Regions:
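M14 metallocarboxypeptidase catalytic domain recognition
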Residues: 4-5, 16-195
């Protein structure tokens, strides 16, 4: 009885107080200012909404056309609804031994920030002079949207209802098999799930 009393009347107010007293705009502006950067991805170049598959493909094809010396596109398979799953390879040919790094984004269709973030990352690697020498040291493989069908309808799951993030061992979804094969073929030394 004393424990319940303690929980209800002591801990509960402590947990609720921050909800009733939100952070001031002054503090937010001081410690979390808007970044002073230009984001050249499809979602940030339109009025609302996230990047759609067709917009992403146009963006990727434009990047490839402008940087064909360092990036190429392959399709590693199809989604359950027949959309091609893109994988980009970034490499500057030189004699250096390089670390192979694999990025995967958009595994959960209702988490669009991962695809938006990876598109920004792609733009920065190819267009920001600060990162010019990065491809002298690493070879990148990037799948920017793994769960295309789920992403298109803002749904966490693939078309067959599976969570692709829970299907790495059973490989029941068509997309999971494609992702596994692409990852294995690339022989990455570092893997990042841009989640």
């Amino acid at each position: 009885m004393k424990t319940k009393f303690f929980l209800y009347f002591f801990l509960l107010p402590i947990m609720l107080f921050p909800q009733l007293n939100p952070q001031s705009k002054k503090l937010t502006k001081k410690f979390f200012p808007d970044p002073n950067i230009e984001i050249n991805t499809p979602a940030f170049n339109k009025k609302k909404g996230f990047t759609k598959y067709d917009e992403m493909m146009s963006f990727l094809n434009e990047q490839i056309a402008n940087h064909s010396d360092v990036v190429k596109l392959e399709f590693v398979g199809e989604s359950q609804k027949g959309k091609q799953i893109p994988m980009l390879f970034f490499d500057r040919k030189n004699s250096n031994e390089k670390v192979k790094v694999f990025f995967q984004a958009g595994l959960h269709g209702n988490e669009p920030a991962s695809t938006e973030g990876i598109l920004y990352f792609i733009d920065q690697i190819l267009n920001n002079e600060k990162y010019n020498n990065l491809l002298d040291r690493i070879t990148l493989a990037i799948i920017p949207m793994a769960n295309i069908d789920g992403y298109e309808i803002n749904n966490r799951y693939a078309s067959n209802g599976l969570d692709l993030n829970r299907d790495h061992t059973k490989l029941l979804a068509k997309e999971s098999k494609c992702l596994k094969q692409a990852f294995s073929d690339f022989e990455a030394e570092v893997s990042v799930d841009f989640h």
